[in-house]
Amino acid sequence: MILMVIVFLLLLFWENELTEDVVLTSMEHLHVDYPQSAVPLRYCNYMILQRVIREPDYTCRKVHVFIHERPQKINRICTSSKKMTCPNYSEIFCFQSDTKFRMTVCQLTGGSKYPACRYQISPTEGFVLVTCDDLGPVNFQGYVE
């Protein structure tokens, strides 16, 4: 009986670990900030620290984009008629949004190792490019102004 309880607890812990990793790498976690967080100063620095956005080797990401649109609107990109080959990938298809989305582009200005990264904020609007699977957007591939 005790062995069964231990096995159950181990499985429960292991399942939660996997779920947390998936959430932390999802497109919504990495790129969607709706409604836009009310951070008056240093928006990019704050958001990148809060969401632990960095390269796998703990270096600072050179450029990062936050999209300020409803997740439902972002999910609809996958049904767009604007299907094309993704930039820099010859065999992967991207979908482009039908309308321009409000975004914030964070450009690295200082630091090289996370968390000592400093960013400049650039509000912009553009057509969003994503890759999709059967459940919706998977990866943000960029934007077109």
Swiss-Prot record:
GO terms for molecular function: nucleic acid binding; RNA nuclease activity. Glycans are attached at residue 88. Transmembrane segments: none annotated. Keywords: Glycoprotein, Secreted, Signal. It comes from the Eukaryota. Residues 1-19 form the signal peptide. GO terms for cellular component: extracellular region. CDD domains: RNase_A (cd00163). Pfam families: RnaseA. Gene3D superfamilies: Ribonuclease A-like domain (3.10.130.10). The keyword Signal applies. One of its GO terms (biological process) is defense response to Gram-positive bacterium. Its main location: secreted. It is found in: Secreted. The keyword Signal applies. Does not exhibit any ribonuclease activity. Belongs to the pancreatic ribonuclease family. PANTHER family: INACTIVE RIBONUCLEASE-LIKE PROTEIN 12-RELATED, RIBONUCLEASE. This is Probable inactive ribonuclease-like protein 12. The gene is Rnase12.
